[in-house]
């Protein structure tokens, strides 16, 4: 059972989509609207390295430039585009000693090309191939557009994370179709390292605040479908702060995602991360093994750029997993 140790950095919560279930999004000028300043991000990155984290998860609202007022927020910190700022943040993370994983919504091929050398992996939740009421005001949630981004990442050989959001109005057949679409892309390009099966959690003040959460049985079935439909080299992940993973492991869960010792889950702020030691106790004789934000097979295949290669080598062991923290420099000096 694998996991990574990360810092969760919500660079901006300004977003062009208005999902019926989202409590993260804000409009410029609203209370809680943010674009993190460089010094704020750098502080989190430095604390993350000190705490032994290997992953900087950069999350963004999608295409914030389309939202009036966001451009001025960018200008205030000295940048002309989100991409320009993100490139700076990724470069800074690498220099500080932590691997970027960017999740910024749908992207063009040229945007992916700009970010590929600076990211250990990238991600975009497919959520569903179904057209849903929850996504009615969301130009970025058109399934074909999301699949196109995932496809372009495959063509560029970017180790990739995607997933399904369970319980937002989709049917079981929709879940099967979504998993089959992901499986087909992986068979073609070999780049999907993990698929998250994430349970919907209602947020107060949203359109779907009274929508029922999916039952545990529904999650067990969804995990079972994922394990059956996805190729065997794709990890099936659940979020241990949103659901007790114990009952899902027998159904095919192999990974517990990024767990942070420092930062909250900004998308689900009410759901605390479990402590890794407590999680290990709960899992009993199933050993927890730490990985990097890029999975071991992709480390071994060399699916990374020269820019991050030395950092990946420093942080990974011979099997491509996380090297025992504290031994990185000692082992480097022995080589």
UniProtKB/Swiss-Prot annotation:
<dbReference type="GO" id="GO:0051539">
    <property type="term" value="F:4 iron, 4 sulfur cluster binding"/>
</dbReference>
<dbReference type="Pfam" id="PF04055">
    <property type="entry name" value="Radical_SAM"/>
</dbReference>
<feature type="binding site">
    <location>
        <position position="19"/>
    </location>
    <ligand>
        <name>[4Fe-4S] cluster</name>
    </ligand>
</feature>
<dbReference type="GO" id="GO:0005506">
    <property type="term" value="F:iron ion binding"/>
</dbReference>
<keyword id="KW-0479">Metal-binding</keyword>
<protein>
    <recommendedName>
        <fullName>7,8-didemethyl-8-hydroxy-5-deazariboflavin synthase</fullName>
        <ecNumber>4.3.1.32</ecNumber>
    </recommendedName>
</protein>
<dbReference type="InterPro" id="IPR013785">
    <property type="entry name" value="Aldolase_TIM"/>
</dbReference>
<feature type="binding site">
    <location>
        <position position="22"/>
    </location>
    <ligand>
        <name>[4Fe-4S] cluster</name>
    </ligand>
</feature>
<feature type="binding site">
    <location>
        <position position="15"/>
    </location>
    <ligand>
        <name>[4Fe-4S] cluster</name>
    </ligand>
</feature>
<keyword id="KW-0456">Lyase</keyword>
<comment type="subunit">
    <text>Consists of two subunits, CofG and CofH.</text>
</comment>
<keyword id="KW-0949">S-adenosyl-L-methionine</keyword>
<dbReference type="InterPro" id="IPR034405">
    <property type="entry name" value="F420"/>
</dbReference>
<feature type="domain" description="Radical SAM core">
    <location>
        <begin position="1"/>
        <end position="246"/>
    </location>
</feature>
<dbReference type="InterPro" id="IPR007197">
    <property type="entry name" value="rSAM"/>
</dbReference>
<comment type="similarity">
    <text>Belongs to the radical SAM superfamily. CofG family.</text>
</comment>
<dbReference type="InterPro" id="IPR019939">
    <property type="entry name" value="CofG_family"/>
</dbReference>
<comment type="function">
    <text>Catalyzes the radical-mediated synthesis of 7,8-didemethyl-8-hydroxy-5-deazariboflavin from 5-amino-5-(4-hydroxybenzyl)-6-(D-ribitylimino)-5,6-dihydrouracil.</text>
</comment>
<dbReference type="GO" id="GO:0044689">
    <property type="term" value="F:7,8-didemethyl-8-hydroxy-5-deazariboflavin synthase activity"/>
</dbReference>
<dbReference type="InterPro" id="IPR006638">
    <property type="entry name" value="Elp3/MiaA/NifB-like_rSAM"/>
</dbReference>
<keyword id="KW-0408">Iron</keyword>
<keyword id="KW-0411">Iron-sulfur</keyword>
<keyword id="KW-0004">4Fe-4S</keyword>
<dbReference type="GO" id="GO:0016765">
    <property type="term" value="F:transferase activity, transferring alkyl or aryl (other than methyl) groups"/>
</dbReference>
<comment type="pathway">
    <text>Cofactor biosynthesis; coenzyme F0 biosynthesis.</text>
</comment>
